[in-house]
Amino acid sequence: MLSSLQNPRQAAAQLMNFAMILSTAFMMWKGLSVATDSPSPIVVVLSGSMEPAFQRGDLLLLWNRNVWQETAVGEVVVYNVKGKDIPIVHRVVRKFGTGDKAKLLTKGDNNNADDTDLYARGQDYLEREDIIGSVIGYFPFVGYVTILLSEHPWLKTVMLGIMGLLVVIQRE
């Protein structure tokens, strides 16, 4: 098992292989960000506020529209609130104005009230710059791994330990 540690060249090759896997995943993420024009092209639904359209744990694919394709009422968007890190997935229920100056009001399908309480202090509506992207597709329950890792931090340690162990004992 630990014989690979006795050969420094093999250990270095395994470390490089692991680094290459991580850098490839990072490059794919950044490439997807550029292609979709979204800083976060994939998000996970963290709550039940969009049921029945989307369930907790669904993985959403986003596309950030340009100026010529305006966000429409009824469209599901993902937005960030100033001062908070968690993206929110909700439907546009009202729109005031057009173009870059349009103001949007959102609401979760499973919520009784609109999102004005979720917006930043002094903000009554969303603006175009708040939108991360519009939902163009989803994979049901694929994002549950992310939720489990967030709710149970010890799972991250276990997963990283297993990955590290696999790198050490891998034979070529």
Curated annotation (Swiss-Prot):
Keywords: Endoplasmic reticulum, Hydrolase, Membrane, Protease, Signal-anchor, Transmembrane, Transmembrane helix. Component of the signal peptidase complex (SPC) composed of a catalytic subunit SEC11 and three accessory subunits SPC1, SPC2 and SPC3. The complex induces a local thinning of the ER membrane which is used to measure the length of the signal peptide (SP) h-region of protein substrates. This ensures the selectivity of the complex towards h-regions shorter than 18-20 amino acids. SPC associates with the translocon complex. Its main location: endoplasmic reticulum. It catalyses: Cleavage of hydrophobic, N-terminal signal or leader sequences from secreted and periplasmic proteins. Its EC number is 3.4.21.89. It is a single-pass type II membrane protein. The keyword Transferase does not apply. This is Signal peptidase complex catalytic subunit SEC11. It is found in: Endoplasmic reticulum membrane. The active site is at residues 49, 90, 115. Residues 36-172 are lumenal. Residues 1-14 are cytoplasmic. Belongs to the peptidase S26B family. GO terms for cellular component: signal peptidase complex. It is an enzyme of class 3 (hydrolase). Catalytic component of the signal peptidase complex (SPC) which catalyzes the cleavage of N-terminal signal sequences from nascent proteins as they are translocated into the lumen of the endoplasmic reticulum. Specifically cleaves N-terminal signal peptides that contain a hydrophobic alpha-helix (h-region) shorter than 18-20 amino acids. The C-terminal short (CTS) helix is essential for catalytic activity. It may be accommodated as a transmembrane helix in the thinned membrane environment of the complex, similarly to the signal peptide in the complex substrates. One of its GO terms (biological process) is signal peptide processing.
